[in-house]
Every structure is written in structure tokens, then in C-alpha cells.
Amino acid sequence: MLMQRRYLQVKDLPPRPDPVTGLPRPPRARGFIGPDVPKDVSLFRERDPALQPSPPPGQSPVLVWYRESRRGAVIAAVMIVLLAAGIASLTRGTAWIMHAKYWGVWAFLAVALVVVYFFFRGGCYSAGADWVARGKKWVKVYDLVKVTSRSYPGGPGVYLRDSGGRTLRFKFVDLSSDRMLWDLTYNGILHSVIAGGARTNDMLRRTLALPYPEPDEGSDS
């Protein structure tokens, strides 16, 4: 069954937020899959203001940022290692838990615990009114020339390239760690596609339910 195309005119785009104040805030965007929890009550996000990242050189201030807290990283690491231990029990039985000859399994699980912890702690996402960053890599979301969705290890994600040649990749689940982070990024993508003609693919349009630019009068499309 083919889905009917939705179209959007440039004049109907949501306004761009002010670079300094971030107002008006972009509307709630489609495709958000994270927990819509206020950041001041979330147990899984870092709250230490000293760890807030700086904006990219010459760009507008940071309006929102997200990094997994130590507690959140520990919980995630323990859950993944317990899952791995459960799989090991299904394939090897439970003898490995106490038997010395299976020390290699314990060593693997210990290493996995550390690796997963630092994996979750290492990702820091931030956004201003017109840019989004992962660590030191960033793009201007209102100047995107290419926005495509791809399958990455751990889930589907998006590839962004702006007019300055900067590129950024992230998984949708990562950017869904914070509602405002998602809304700011989506609004920029929407403007780039509708007003700027950024190149997209079918997977992105399906995932984010992106509308198409309103065709010119007399166009056959």
C-alpha cells in the first residue's frame, strides 16, 4: 500500500529559533522515540554544568546537551553484561559460573562491562539554535545539502552533510535522548529539505515522515 505524499510550502515552515535565546522553541517533531522526561528529574543524564560542552567555534550558544550519567552508564553496562551472561548460560549451561576452567568467560564479561560503560559515557550530544554536534563534530542544520537515513550497528541513523562540507552521523536512538535536542535538529532538517532542497532518501522520509516540498505550479511531479 502506497502512502499518500504530504506536501509543505516554505511559507508554512515553523519559524527558526533565535540564535541566542532559542525562542520560539521548535514544535514537537515527528520520530522522537526517547523517554519524554524533564532533564531535571532524569536519572540517566549528566547534570554537572562543568561538563557542558562548548559551542563550535564562532557558533551560537549551547541550548541543550546530553551525556549519559555515570549511574546511567553503569546500569546500561550491567544490563548488557547480564544479557550476555544469560546467552552464555543458554549455550554452555550454568557450570561456567563456578567452574575455574571457564575463567575466560568471566574475563570477557569483565572487559565487556568496562567497554560498554565507557561507550555510553563517551557520547556527548549538544545543539544550538542552528547547529547540532556529537563531540567535536558538528553541522549547521539549516544549511544541510544531504540528509539520508542509513542502517548502523545498534539501529537506524542519519547522515548529515552541510554546505561547508562538514558531516555528522548519529543513530536516532542517541538523538532521542533529549526532546529539545531532537526538536532543534528536526526543525533544521525540515527547513533544509523544504526550503533548501537538501537531498534525502526514502528511508529517511519513512522514518521521520518528512513532507515533500510543494511542487511548482505546472510541474508534473
Where in the sequence are the language-model features?
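Hydrophobic, well-ordered secondary-structure segments
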Residues: 55, 83-93, 109-111, 116, ...
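N-terminal transmembrane hairpin
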Residues: 81, 88, 95-101, 123-124, ...
